[in-house]
């Protein structure tokens, strides 16, 4: 369904890089991390090809009853063979998805690479009627 998931966040001097890693792993498990020091901040990236990579998002979207909102953000971030969404870093650390990426610490960016974005969106965040998936 997807080829790769990449997650990226900027880590500022006031932040603990291990906590940012935890926030990222709370959304996408099995990430392999790399850090790039840019002086004033670190760019932390994690990548995975694990088949279970999107299972946690799948569960969070349903558990938080945000399928319609998630679908809207997935469609908005759909570009060719990539779907890009941005989520709040602090909410992710708490194990919650919040699409309000406005934060002084910056968002966590999730890039899903897929040859079939429509199928992926239909699985991850199907359209609903009265909160019940209809796809």
Curated annotation (Swiss-Prot):
InterPro entries registered for this protein in UniProt: PAB1135-like, Ribosomal_uL5_dom_sf
Domain of life, source organism: Archaea
Pfam family of the protein (one): RNA_binding
Family, as annotated: Belongs to the UPF0201 family.
Alphabetized NCBIfam families for the sequence: PRK00447.1
The protein's name: UPF0201 protein TON_1346
Source organism per UniProt: Thermococcus onnurineus (strain NA1)
């Amino acid at each position: 369904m997807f080829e790769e998931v990449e997650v990226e966040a900027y880590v500022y001097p006031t932040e603990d890089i291990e906590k940012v890693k935890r926030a990222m792993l709370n959304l996408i498990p099995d990430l392999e991390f790399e850090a790039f020091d840019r002086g004033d901040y670190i760019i932390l990236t994690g990548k995975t090809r694990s088949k279970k990579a999107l299972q946690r998002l799948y569960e969070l979207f349903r558990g938080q009853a945000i399928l319609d909102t998630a679908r809207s953000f997935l469609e908005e971030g759909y570009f060719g063979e990539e779907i890009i969404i941005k989520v709040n870093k602090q909410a992710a650390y708490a194990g919650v998805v919040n699409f309000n990426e406005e934060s002084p610490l910056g968002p966590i960016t999730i890039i899903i690479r897929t040859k079939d974005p429509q199928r992926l969106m239909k699985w991850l965040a199907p359209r609903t009627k009265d909160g019940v998936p209809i796809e």
